[in-house]
A protein has these predicted regions:
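Catalytic glycan-binding domains that act on GlcNAc-containing polysaccharides
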Residues: 1-137
């Protein structure tokens, strides 16, 4: 569970203790506010959860109720895609931008999520393939 992952980091990985403590506090607030069982939400070893793999503080800051049902749901594709778009926008992504260089807004917004150049390059390459496929379907 997300709770177990963060709790373990607090007690077993001293260099991540402060970070994990803050994330656990965010997670507990989220569970309390949405009346969720802290042990029922599965996540990664780092405490990320949902289809978008948000850490608790990012979920708090960037998640949106895109389907307008009154709840931000980490396992609802509508909310997740809206939340990911919100995350990218809040981290500098500009609609209709086509600058994929390291100095461009697109690159920087993806890099804000994962500080690994290889990750960003893979996401941008996949983006281009999806865009080409969509354009091909529209012709």
């Amino acid at each position: 569970s997300v709770f177990n992952a963060l709790y373990s980091q607090i007690h077993e990985i001293p260099r991540r203790s402060k970070w994990a403590s803050r994330e656990l506090a965010e997670f507990l607030k989220y569970c309390f506010n949405d009346n969720l069982d802290t042990q029922e939400i599965g996540g990664s070893y780092a405490g990320a959860f949902g289809y978008g793999q948000f850490i608790p503080s990012s979920f708090t800051s960037y998640s949106v109720d895109f389907n307008q049902n009154g709840v931000r749901e980490p396992y609802s594709w509508e909310d997740v895609l809206g939340s990911i778009a919100n995350y990218l926008r809040m981290n500098g992504y500009k609609p209709n931008s086509s600058d994929y260089s390291k100095k461009g807004d697109i690159y920087k917004s993806v890099y804000a999520y994962n500080h690994a150049d290889n990750y960003v390059m893979a996401v941008l390459e996949l983006t281009e393939k999806i865009r080409a496929r969509v354009n091909q379907s529209n012709n």
